[in-house]
Amino acid sequence: MANNVGVLLATDMQALPDSVEQWAIKNYEDKLSGGASLQVAKNILESSFKLEAGTSSMGAVVSLVQTPGLHSPAYLAEVARVLVSGGDLIVQEPLLAEAQEQKCSSAQTKAQLERNLLLAGFVNLEVVDSVVGVEIAKACTTSSVALNVVAVKSSKPSWDTGSVFQIRKKVSNQNGNFRTSGNYQPVKLTAGETVDDFPLNSKPAVKVDLSSDFKNDEEELIDEDDLLTEEDLKAPVLPAAESCAPTKKACKNCTCGRAELEEKEQETKLTTAQINNPTSSCGSCGLGDAFRCAGCPYRGMPTFKLGEKVFSGFLLWNQYIRSVPLISKLGNITLGGSLLVADA
């Protein structure tokens, strides 16, 4: 700890008795040696709990208040700011004897005070003898509220934010012997040693041996095929043509039969005149579906030349034969290559 750090007495009183300053000089003689001074901060309530001391400038702080509840987390955080790492802190204030209706609204219990100290980062809390000379505020001395002056000593940790320190570990070797790292020093492992991060007093983990579950090979196993029912073994039924997505035409690789239904429907829509002498008002009907409008009767048909007969599959060809009286009288008609053969 630096030699120039001092001791701070903080209070909400207008002035501290001389006996309190003498007590501080006697108890912190080691910290006041080497040119360090004893400083007094009065009326901390009026200064909004802001201390004029610099950051990490005090080796010890003694906060003596006569108003209950002044040691709030915000004020204790300000005290931690002015304390050096490892500095001592004594807080003293009137506390409630036990949890009860608070007529003095700011009063808190000893447990609440210790909780505030822990939240502010202080450690090593212990109750010490109170400093004589600081009494309870008269505004809170009512017969219905039991208040006792209590002093709690604590210290600021010796490490700062971002500090790195070693964690004590337990080391075991192949022989089962254990050794520790001593006073939190790094452990250097030798060959065959392992590090155990569990606390020294922790119980060993329970080991579960599952290998015995597979030693008996004679046990009867369940055939997964026996779990299948007749419904599971049935082939799935393909959806009907109506189950296709609501598109204008069948899919490119249609397998549900919709393409055939559309072709039949298209063939039945064409009249004899449209088959024998196809015409087009737009001139694009014979170029294919890419050039046909949505209402074109030739949608789905292959390309053809306007003014020539349209042949689209066996059904359309059969319809065309039935519509021509002369050919229908010839009897059986077969199509071989590009020749039309009719039996009289």
Swiss-Prot record:
This is Anamorsin homolog 1. Residues 244-256 are annotated as: Fe-S binding site A. It holds the Pfam family Anamorsin_N. GO terms for biological process: iron-sulfur cluster assembly. It comes from Physcomitrium patens. Keywords: 2Fe-2S, 4Fe-4S, Cytoplasm, Iron, Iron-sulfur, Metal-binding, Mitochondrion. One of its GO terms (molecular function) is electron transfer activity. [4Fe-4S] cluster binds at C282, C285, C293, C296.
